């Protein structure tokens, strides 16, 4: 039966209201998802955790990770300055981001909640080019169960003892940010001349300069070397799994760097990339970082990492990460000249 005109008139407002409610939802369903290509050095086992948490908080934005070592990604970003590539970085060394910022490759942005980020964990500009997420530092993984003849070192210089001949591994600083923070830390701690003398003596004991920061500690865990120079997360994780290692914090101090996040200048999805930055700086994200690292950027989050010796925060060197960034190419060129023959091939 046809509707009477008066009834039709009464129904039209309700139908229009229903259509207005449904149309945005339908349009949202039809809108294609945005995919962000994000360069990272974060540990493989952390990437799914970060991706799932971000995508749950930001429906319609998907992360495509590209993971590699810090030095490799830094060189790649410098090479991509004209053609572009990634949209953002999340988990790249601050020493790298300082350089990328000075080269004009970053898009400054003040993420939501910036006021809760420790000022030491961000670019100093009013609108920061990058923000830090967590600190990671150098440690020594020692396996005396497999190598009872080696002494227990209390200082970095102790690793030059001939008792460690062929029984030390450290990350290759040409590819690994952890390797570079060790070298830059020794130079700032000892002075250049003394630091190169120490590294000459250490090189006599090094079995290999490993391609990744995790590998030296893994090598110590299985007894391939006695001392694996690595970083605190991997050391604590392997010890939690039952590896027969002691985690040592050398008395002179620990080199360190920050993992950090930034939007890249050439991104085709700047709004989505800014939402990534908002999440990277959030308390929720920092609670994820705090399950893996001893020091995070958010002032309202206190990590508690099992199996690490007490006092790690107090052992961090009072180092200048801007200096480490500015001198990276010079230091690495000299390091390659002296020790490149022992670098592990990919």
For each of these PLM feature ranges, what is it?
Residues 116-120, 136, 198-203, 209-210, ...:
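Periplasmic-binding protein-like
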Residues 11-23:
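Bacterial N-terminal signal peptides
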Residues 28-98:
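Early extracytoplasmic/lumenal segment of secretory-pathway proteins
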Residues 41-48, 71, 85-224:
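Extracytoplasmic ligand-binding site segments that recognize negatively charged/polar headgroups
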Residues 264-319:
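Mature extracytoplasmic/periplasmic domains
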């Amino acid at each position: 039966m046809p509707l009477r005109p008066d009834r039709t008139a009464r129904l039209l407002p309700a139908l229009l209201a229903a259509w207005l409610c449904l149309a945005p939802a339908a349009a949202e369903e039809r809108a294609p998802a945005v995919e962000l290509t994000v360069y990272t050095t974060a540990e493989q086992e952390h990437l799914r955790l970060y991706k799932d948490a971000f995508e749950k908080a930001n429906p319609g934005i998907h992360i495509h990770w590209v993971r590699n070592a810090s030095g490799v990604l830094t060189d790649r970003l410098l090479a991509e300055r004209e053609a572009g590539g990634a949209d953002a970085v999340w988990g790249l060394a601050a020493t790298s981001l300082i350089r990328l910022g000075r080269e004009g490759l970053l898009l400054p942005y003040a993420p939501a909640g910036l006021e809760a980020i420790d000022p030491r964990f961000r670019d100093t500009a009013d609108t920061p080019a990058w923000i830090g997420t967590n600190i990671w530092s150098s440690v020594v993984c020692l396996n005396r169960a497999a190598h009872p003849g080696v002494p227990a070192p209390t200082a970095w210089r102790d690793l030059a003892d001939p008792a460690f001949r062929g029984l030390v591994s450290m990350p290759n600083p040409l590819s690994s940010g952890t390797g570079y923070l060790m070298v830059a830390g020794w130079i700032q701690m000892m002075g250049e001349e003394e630091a190169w003398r120490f590294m000459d003596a250490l090189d006599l004991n090094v079995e290999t300069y490993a391609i990744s920061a995790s590998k030296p500690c893994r090598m110590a865990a299985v007894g391939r070397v006695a001392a694996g120079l690595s970083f605190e997360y991997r050391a604590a994780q392997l010890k939690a799994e039952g590896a027969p290692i002691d985690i040592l914090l050398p008395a002179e101090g620990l080199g360190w760097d920050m993992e950090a996040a930034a939007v890249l200048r050439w991104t085709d999805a700047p709004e989505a990339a800014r939402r990534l930055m908002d999440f990277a700086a959030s308390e929720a994200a920092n609670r994820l970082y705090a399950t893996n690292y001893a020091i995070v950027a958010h002032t309202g989050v206190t990590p508690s990492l099992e199996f690490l010796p007490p006092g790690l925060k107090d052992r961090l060197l009072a180092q200048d990460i801007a200096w480490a960034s500015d001198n990276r190419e010079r230091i690495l060129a000299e390091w390659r000249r002296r020790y490149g023959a022992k670098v592990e091939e990919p």
